[in-house]
């Protein structure tokens, strides 16, 4: 019987975590052939927040961990953030720098449709995204559409519409990038599980999530998974 009590499937309504229900003697897996000891040590530090007994051994490629500010290579990179907000901010920066960038989720087109519609609704009262056309006004849309991207876009539009328009341009530009030729691929931690990339950068927005343990706030289980970097893991941290 093999199981993983941290799998998201157990969070579905009515889902039962078999690892907590069935009496068993547990033998946790403690070795990984996907990365070396440096990443294994980092994984251990993070996972011990959930279970102090965890100890990971890296038996794979001798992976290196360095500060993001020291990155000077030009190989394709996977950028992983804790939140969608950081991901979209990074897309805008990449657009300004003209670094070919794509969203791993494949949702750039959907995001563009929603964002453009919300901007047009706010400024001209003419939503362009069909599901938005049922609302009488922009405020009603914002009140009713509570998915994460709509909430993010509404906040951006209301706080700084010029920034929202920059994101609109960045999303449109990203759609023209061929994924195989992208130098930067953006993904959230939740969607990165199972991916393998030679070069990975972790955003600095993970530190707030990990620090939340000190205040007794649980970190979402899916975020406890580290990327399967084969060669290099870059941490986006400040010098302090």
Please give the residue ranges for each predicted region.
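Conserved helicase motor core of SF1/SF2 NTP-dependent helicases
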Residues: 1-67, 74, 78-96, 104-113, ...
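Short phosphate-binding/catalytic loops that engage adenosine nucleotides
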Residues: 99
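Accessory recognition modules or surfaces
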Residues: 113-116, 121
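Conserved helicase C-terminal RecA-like lobe
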Residues: 120-240
